Amino acid sequence: MTSQFSPKVSEILAYSREEATRLASRSVGPEHLLLGIIRDRKSNVCDVLRRMAINTDIIKAELEDRVREDNYSQPLITTELVLNDKASNILKLAVLEARVQHTQTVDVEHLLLAMLHDKSDNGAKIVLESNNITYDDALAYLHKTSKP
């Protein structure tokens, strides 16, 4: 694969694992990826969310509630946190998003777009859409912020 992940995406993945550990999850899912993204308040994605008048504290609380509900039925059975199938799929979609945007490096905005573009029901997408964040809107805002 010619695309590679930016250092920021690697940082987000580390944050996501920390969030999964903090919330006693069995694996890292899309919700943890989004928690990792919004943890970096200075990121381009958080700036876009602010421009869209989105309160990231509300998104964080909704994601945490969703993860906690899932954890009641799925007790922690491992100490090795890995990406679950949905999160792995989002990373693959992020690579495709980067290609569509004609960039070689997968960055944080590609993760956000991948979450929103994912055809499966993932908790991150559900929370984003319930807060009126759509793929088309996010893409438009990201294009506005990337222009000089």
Regions found by a protein language model. Give the residues of each.
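Histone-fold recognition with a strong bias for associated Lys/Arg-rich disordered tails
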Residues: 1-148
